[in-house]
Regions:
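Active-site-proximal loop/helix segment associated with metal-binding centers of metalloenzymes
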Residues: 1-66
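Active-site environment of divalent metal-dependent phosphoester hydrolases
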Residues: 3-4, 46-51, 75, 81-96
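Alpha-helical hydrophobic/aromatic positions enriched in membrane-embedded helices and signal peptides
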Residues: 35, 79-80
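A structural signal for short, well-ordered beta-strand segments and their strand-loop junctions
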Residues: 39-43, 85-86, 105-106
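Binuclear metal-dependent phosphoesterase catalytic core
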Residues: 62-63, 73-78, 89-131
Length: 131
């Protein structure tokens, strides 16, 4: 509901809802110095994984700020990780495997068994990792 309230009033987002440049640089440093990562959790997704089929119809996407998605795209491209999970788009989706890595979009209607997610194989589906 909050999203539609904001959109009706032409309010896109508030500055403190996103990382600032200093915080983004901290993330880049973590990627360079602390990899590999077993699991990445983020609110939104890396840009290449944006589910365009879930975008709001009638909303000019050129007016939508994609700073965080582009930043996470940079992180994802440069990061050694096994699994990545995000929400934001209010849907459940298990993306196709890429280089032994798995991307998962979650909504609050399902609970994923973290152990099953971390140990899943390419032959398994979303239903196999539900708690």
């Amino acid at each position: 509901m909050y999203k539609y309230y904001r959109l009706a009033r032409h309010l896109t987002w508030y500055k403190d809802e996103q990382l600032d440049e200093k915080e983004m640089e901290l993330g880049r440093n973590l990627c360079r110095n602390e990899a590999p990562f077993d699991l990445v959790l983020s609110h939104t997704c890396p840009y290449p994984y944006e589910p365009t089929d879930l975008f709001l119809a009638g909303l000019d996407q050129s007016t939508v700020d994609s700073t965080m998605e582009r930043y996470l795209g940079e992180i994802e491209f440069n990061l050694d990780y096994k699994r990545w999970a995000f929400g934001h788009f209010h849907a459940d989706r298990l993306y196709p495997w890429a280089d032994g890595r798995q991307m998962l979009m979650l909504f609050n209607e399902n609970v994923v068994n973290l152990d099953k997610f971390m140990n899943m194989t390419e032959k398994q589906s979303f239903k196999d990792i539900i708690a």
